[in-house]
Amino acid sequence: MSAVTGLVRSEIHGGDVAVLTLDRPRANAINPALVADLRRAVADAAGAPALLLASSQGLFSAGWDLPTVRTFGREEMSRFLADFTALMRELFSFDGPVVAALPGHAIAGGLILASGADERIAAEGKGEFGLSEVALGVPIPRAAYEIFRYILGDRGAERLAAAGDNVSAVRALEMGFLDRIVPGEDLLDVAVGRARQLAGRSRAAYAEIKRRARAGTLARFDRASDGDPFLDFWFSEEARGRIDQLVARLTKKA
């Protein structure tokens, strides 16, 4: 069974793995429509034994659609941030296994999106992984930071977010963000196989272990938006200047 929800293709692979494929040219840049479609697809897959996040392109996601979100006023940006944060919680708290197949770059919001998976499998090659928000004059949102603390620990999350460097797949594996690197032609098969393997565990036991392991992180995640200065940074003079410069470069390349 397959379905297309706007910018996300949904397919039940082999009867047990719900494959959600990001399909937004170009670069799967994250805008409100993609967030809404992905949230809808995740909700529709709630009963699936396992969930797989994939991409129709040679990369996973280049992050937020800056030329679009740059035009948002504070209220619209606040809604977008709230919806993106809700998506991250829905992925991170999904009670079945969630695997992400990363064919290439996962940058900024794209890396945050991938962090919602239980395991991340990347293709060999020149893909880069990083949190580049600091280069734009903004920190990553507090709620998202809690997920990186869960994956990398306090020091690892700080180094990734504060340095703003993009790293190779090999380095991301060494850091503990990636779980496996495979040849690109094998990526989808390996990721589906891993999701199916995890789905073969007791669903109730797997869900209980996830709840125990993530309870503290989710509690901090739910408190994180209160007093988060992200929007103050986003609308600061420094950030606006940096974002405008990047958007100008992106527009010129297009």
Task: Describe the role of every protein-language-model region.
Residues 1-56, 75, 89:
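Conserved CoA-thioester-binding segment of acyl-CoA-metabolizing enzymes
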Residues 2, 242-254:
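Terminal low-complexity tails and localization/encapsulation signals of metabolic enzymes
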Residues 55-89:
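Glycine- (often His-adjacent) and acidic-residue-rich active-site loop
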Residues 101-107, 161-165:
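Glycine-rich beta-to-alpha transition loops that act as phosphate-gripper elements at the mouths
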Residues 107-160, 190-194:
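CoA-thioester-processing core
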Residues 119, 159, 163-165, 171, ...:
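Well-ordered beta-strand positions
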Residues 122-127, 178-224, 250-254:
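C-terminal long alpha-helix characteristic of the crotonase
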